[in-house]
Amino acid sequence: LSLADSLMSELLKMTPYDFENLIVRLLIKMGYGTLKQNESAVTQKSGDEGIDGIVSADKFGFDSIYIQAKKWRSDTTVGRPEIQRFLGALAGQGATKGIFITTAHFSKEATAFAEKQLHQKIVLVDGNQLTELMIEYNLGVSVVETYVVKRVDYDFFNDDL
């Protein structure tokens, strides 16, 4: 199994609530919000009105990004109806930005629908993109080996010593 496949296997074992927490942690590692100032949160388990979490768009908390996290089998497809429901949930919160993250894939109709929204920006992240982001931001993975390659710094020798 590849690293991404192994990560997906672990993601699929998580409870939905733990998966939502992982998504918020990933977004924090990517530079959104900060847990220290309680700017990022997973919403309560029930009655979340279609919103699984909220992160601030920047360190100052000027804008919020609403999260929908769906841990579905990786061979399933998220369709347009799910994106429409998320859009409705965003509207209910008065929100303009949302991220729909899933372990599954998005249908062409879902992607096209999200892309044509004018008043609300919805970013779709599928299972492949999710595992790539986890690897890139070192969430749920550890570095086994690091190689340092050095070369001569010619600028150092050209400056006045």
Each model region followed by its residue ranges:
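Mixed-charge (Asp/Glu-Lys/Arg
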Residues: L1-L161
